[in-house]
Regions:
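Terminal disorder- and signal-encoded targeting elements
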Residues: 1-18, 318-322
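Active-site beta->alpha loop and helix N-cap motifs at the rims of alpha/beta catalytic domains
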Residues: 15-157, 314-315
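A general structural signal for well-ordered alpha-helical segments in protein cores
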Residues: 25, 43, 75, 79, ...
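Structured C-terminal cap/extension of enzyme domains
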Residues: 38, 214-322
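Short, amphipathic alpha-helical "lid/cap" segments that border enzyme active or binding sites
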Residues: 43-47, 163, 297-304
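Alpha-helical structural signal in soluble globular domains
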Residues: 53, 77, 81-85, 109, ...
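Glycine-rich phosphate-binding "P-loop"
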Residues: 152, 175, 287
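Catalytic alpha/beta core domains of metabolic enzymes, predominantly
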Residues: 156-254, 259
């Protein structure tokens, strides 16, 4: 039975007026049963597992959570389930849309459910101009008084949010961060430089670029890989933001094969397969996404086995604990 069926309410929850965006924020998967229904019990278990591993927050109902194939009610149910399942970590709810009105509605519902912050993907398919992007984000930020993160992923949306646009939006008191998934390190560097005077955080949206982005002044990552290796990813980012780049590099190189392979096919296809291999839940995807190819699955399982072997050696005192 879904949270809506149980009539959960969150009227007693006070929204956070601030949020620390330092560290690792897993972009959570949404587990589905073989017939395509959401498995809320496994979703709750994964939220608790990630909190126990020491992550800084959780991000349900985003791209990795297959938000594009969730109904609006399912979208909110997923967010509520994660909120109800954890104790202390903030929940950053994915609530973007290509329609400003729809994004505003989803964001209001997420805030009412008790989300601590919002992650807002830029409008996709309709390809707005920079002025339209500014209006879109300001409309939501003016209406909803909780922290909001601008999410730039032009490979999915068809629109790039220019650094100057981000810098303008950063002056709004409710727009507190930027998820960088353009793959353009030069552009990300420009965003960091132009927002340094603001109370504003730049987060990697691409695991393999997390270390260089932290080196530029970024504060962490909204991570796919942390669904699989939360403690190790947290250790890497912690080392990077504290300036221990030797340790951060070592951890990066250990995790890099996983980070790269999780995007060998469309996200979240590989991470769903990895979740299943680690017994973190079913690998079921909603159409039109399809299962990971046998070739890529075999390589993924080899990478996961290598990480497990490294961990066993570390526990035996033969290598550095990762």
């Amino acid at each position: 039975m879904s949270p809506t069926d149980n009539q959960h309410t969150h009227t007693d929850i006070q929204h956070m007026t601030d949020i620390d965006l330092t560290g690792v924020f897993p972009a959570m998967t949404t587990p589905f049963t073989p017939d395509g229904r959401i498995d809320y019990d496994i979703l709750a278990q994964n939220a608790q597992r990630l909190e126990t591993a020491g992550v800084s927050g959780l991000v349900p109902a985003g791209s990795t959570g297959e938000s594009a194939t969730l109904t609006h009610d399912e979208h909110i149910d997923v967010i509520e389930t994660v909120i109800d399942s954890v104790n202390d970590v903030p929940v950053i709810a994915g609530s973007g849309s290509n329609s400003t009105r729809e994004a505003l509605n989803l964001s209001e519902r997420a805030a009412d459910a008790g989300a601590d912050a919002l992650l807002l993907i830029s409008p996709y398919y309709n390809i707005p101009e920079q002025a339209g992007l500014k209006d879109h984000y300001r409309t939501i930020a003016d209406a909803i008084d909780i922290p909001q993160i601008v999410y730039n992923v032009p490979g999915r949306t068809g629109t790039n949010i220019e650094p100057e646009t981000v810098a303008t939006l950063a002056s709004h008191r409710n727009i507190v961060g930027y998820k960088a998934a353009s793959g353009d390190v030069g552009q990300i560097s420009s965003v960091v430089e132009q927002t340094r005077s603001e109370a504003f955080s730049v987060l990697s949206g691409d695991d393999i670029l997390t270390l260089p982005i932290c080196g530029l002044g970024g504060s962490g990552v909204i991570s796919v890989g942390a669904n699989i290796e939360p403690a190790q990813t947290t250790a890497m980012v912690g080392a990077a933001v504290s300036g221990d780049y030797d340790r951060a590099r070592n951890l990066h190189y250990q995790l890099a094969p996983l980070f790269e392979h999780l995007f060998v096919e469309t996200n979240p296809i590989p991470v769903k397969a990895a979740m299943e291999y680690r017994d973190y839940g079913p690998g079921t995807l909603r159409p039109p996404l399809t299962d990971l190819s046998d070739k890529h699955r075999k390589r993924l399982e080899s990478i996961l086995d290598d990480l497990d072997a490294d961990r066993e050696m570390a526990l035996a005192g033969q290598t550095e604990v990762i």
